[in-house]
Amino acid sequence: MKTQAEIIEFIHDKSLVSALGGNELPSFISAVLGKPWKPSSRGFTGWMDWWSIKISGQSVAHVSQDIEGREDILADRIFRRTRTFVSNKLWPIVDTIVRHHQDPAVKREILSDIELKILEAIETEGSIRTDRLRKKLKLEAKENNSRFHRSLTNLESYGLIVGIEDPHPEKHLHANIWQTWETRTQETRGRASLSYSEALAKLLVKTIDASVLVREDQIPRWFKWSSDIQAAKDQLILDGAILKSGQYLFSSNVRDVNS
């Protein structure tokens, strides 16, 4: 893909796209390169394979930042705790799942005290940058680094918060601006009349559609709520909404294409 418009169309077509790849989802970077991508070396130098590539006259990094800030696409970590672009076509489904985990009783069960405080602070502020969030919560000391960033990742993995890199940072400062799911998606989300179990089933189908072919034993590692998804998966197989062959599951779209 050579233009930003093509990349945006690709994300909307797949609904879920991995930012860097290395998992079952189609990859943003592989789509840009036109071939599967793995870093050629460890550390920062491994990213140089693609970091300098230009798309529509802009660097891949700049295009990625533009895309995650769009009104119809966001980037979170709901899939395998890795950076994932999510089309607004999927937001009504994810919204039902996020709302389930926003329930006070559920939140207290799944989140630590620090995660609850971070979420409350982001809810109160509406939008807040990482450094200011740390200052507000008095977590600026170095010994809090790991715990703080791990907590942010966990909240992203549940879809409860969404971050975008600050487009106008101060010199040498790279930091996300955080919002709750509700704030980030409120303008264009739409509302689906789905139960929690129905939303889980639809998300699983969409994920397998995007991935085409997956190992069944990997599904429990996909989402933070994977323990709730087993019954939905079994029913989808019975209904023919997803297909099974040995240890693999694949999209029913494959059958439709071949029929």
Show the residue positions of the predicted features.
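Long, low-complexity intrinsically disordered regions
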Residues: 1-259
